[in-house]
Design a protein with these regions (language model features):
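A glycine-rich helix N-cap at a beta->alpha junction
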Residues: 1-9
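Short, solvent-exposed turn/loop segments enriched in Gly/Ser/Thr/Pro and often Arg
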Residues: 3, 13-16, 40-41, 167-168
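Conserved short loop/turn motifs at secondary-structure junctions
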Residues: 8-17, 141-143
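Active-site cores that bind ATP or allylic diphosphates and position pyrophosphate for catalysis
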Residues: 27-168
Length: 168
């Protein structure tokens, strides 16, 4: 099974799976687990600096989370620059890593993460969650540099109702 030999779980290149990602982005948007964010780079930097000044770890403030549907529709029709953010619930994310053992993260420290540039252009943490589910991946082996991505991926899996693979 793979891109060179094919198989039942195929389309293996992310560029060939855009409609699959769109389906799941649309699901999260419909369920209000994700939302359009129209914040500019300057606004995000101002918010970041304000948090640092207050001695807080910088994270997205969530200000676009409560935009009215009508406002979002107008901004999208106007072609306003945007991304799609996943609403991170305030919870502890706990999982068992097959190498490191039990790991726990405080999701409230993360802030809402960007999962797509638009419904058909997913970013890494979203795309791998969908790919793992659609391709029936049971074990995710990753480097230490991706350990911090795991709680984000687990929260996205839970929001989509996907089973959680084993991590190592």
């Amino acid at each position: 099974e793979g891109p060179d030999i094919g198989g039942s779980l195929g389309r293996y290149r992310q560029s060939e799976r855009l409609e699959i990602y769109k389906k799941y982005v649309d699901q999260l948007l419909k369920e209000k687990r994700a939302y359009y964010c129209f914040c500019t780079k300057d606004e995000l930097e101002q918010d970041r600096q304000a948090m640092l000044t207050q001695g807080l770890a910088p994270k997205y403030s969530g200000k676009c989370r409560s935009l009215e549907d009508g406002t979002v529709t107008i901004q999208l029709k106007n072609g306003d620059s945007h991304v799609i953010r996943f609403h991170i619930p305030e919870a502890r994310v706990e999982f068992k890593d097959l190498i490191r053992g039990s790991i726990s993260f405080d999701a409230a420290l993360m802030g809402d993460i960007v999962i797509a540039k638009d419904p058909t252009v997913p970013l890494y943490n979203f795309a791998v969650v969908v790919d793992d589910y659609e391709m029936e991946i049971s074990h995710v082996i990753r480097g230490e540099d991706h350990l911090a991505n795991t709680p984000k991926q687990i929260l996205i899996q839970a929001a989509l109702g996907f089973p959680q693979p084993e991590y190592a």
